[in-house]
Amino acid sequence: MKKFILGLFLILGAVSIAAPEYVDVKGMEKKGYIIYKNKKDSLVAFKITQNDRIGVTLYFSDKDNAEYLTNTFKRSAPSALKFLDEFENNRAYIQRFKGELYIYNIIAKEQKVNGCYVTITFSEIDDLTEEKLNEKIDILLDEVE
């Protein structure tokens, strides 16, 4: 049991140092996010609550941009998802898909830190109105950025 606990702490310690210093991994965990993957080029986290299913990916790259990520996600989306449309608001590029649920993928337009791109994917039972969607985007970006 002691070896298991020691191994767990070593793994968690290694995971905690993979993201750049400016990423508050512990802060994300305190907000209920589970860190799934933490590499030098990306960090993937999930948050599952009774009402929400949220996936966050932070990409660390000086070569790409938000529009590139938007196109990449659209091309690589699972075939079970039907692409409905894409649009933007003042803070993000937004893609809307339909599977069993409505899936929204948002890519922040502005980088708080140069070379760190924030993408958030979340699901909803019903299609959101523009007003509700903008509210949700603001809440999620404020929480993650």
Which residue ranges define each predicted feature?
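Short, solvent-exposed coil/turn segments at beta-strand boundaries
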Residues: 29-31, 49-51, 64, 88-89, ...
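Short, surface-exposed coil-to-beta transition loops
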Residues: 40-44, 53-55, 98-107
